[in-house]
Amino acid sequence: MAENCTLDSEQAVLLFKEYNLFITAFLLFLTILLQYGYATRSRTIYILKMIVLWCFWPLNIAVGVISCIYPPNTGGLVAAIILTVFACLSFVGYWIQSCRLFKRCRSWWSFNPESNAVGSILLTNGQQCNFAIESVPMVLAPIIKNGVLYCEGQWLAKCEPDHLPKDIFVCTPDRRNIYRMVQKYTGDQSGNKKRFATFVYAKQSVDTGELESVATGGSSLYT
């Protein structure tokens, strides 16, 4: 007969005492990721957070498979199968949507597990600036401050006000949302037009094109 491997309270306490430093460091690591892992705060920590979130799905699937192999009882086996199938379908669905988005915008932000949209600004100097965005807004307002372009609070690139295009884009797996510049404000209180600039882009149209084809003429808003 197989031995019962359940830990008693004394063994659990001893195990915690032995690994408490590791547990403390691991919890601190997760706390820093969750609290400071935003694209507007630290791009490095944010990317690390995305990697950790991505690893959770394979980990869930692996634990689910183990639960199916070693179920506590019949009810536990049924629950383990349902949860494992759900985890597998969710992970496959994530990859399908991410690959569709990558095909549309050619940005690694397509694999961001926190979002299903990527913003793209094709500067007139040839640079392409991509940024993570949680949803598809009606208005975007990128700014240039001291020669640096920001959008949605994220540092994108060094550029001049004249480098901003007439249209910018927010891509989703099935749509390309096109934003047209409707207003432009340049200059600060000192009159320096290169130091600060604000641009207002309003949602103009929606189509199913990719960023390689930027023709927007004749597109209606919900085609």
From Swiss-Prot:
Keywords of this entry: Glycoprotein, Host Golgi apparatus, Host membrane, Membrane, Transmembrane, Transmembrane helix, Viral envelope protein, Viral matrix protein, Virion
Subunit structure: Homomultimer. Interacts with envelope E protein in the budding compartment of the host cell, which is located between endoplasmic reticulum and the Golgi complex. Forms a complex with HE and S proteins. Interacts with nucleocapsid N protein. This interaction probably participates in RNA packaging into the virus.
S-S pairs: none
GO molecular-function terms, A-Z: structural constituent of virion
Transmembrane parts of this sequence: 19-39, 50-70, 76-96
Natural source organism: Avian infectious bronchitis virus (strain Gray)
Residue intervals on the Intravirion side: 40-49, 97-223
This protein's name: Membrane protein
Family: Belongs to the gammacoronaviruses M protein family.
Superkingdom, natural source: Viruses
Membrane side Virion surface: residue ranges: 1-18, 71-75
Role of this protein: Component of the viral envelope that plays a central role in virus morphogenesis and assembly via its interactions with other viral proteins.
One Gene Ontology term, aspect cellular component: membrane
Recorded topology in the membrane: Multi-pass membrane protein
Cell compartment(s), UniProt: Virion membrane; Host Golgi apparatus membrane
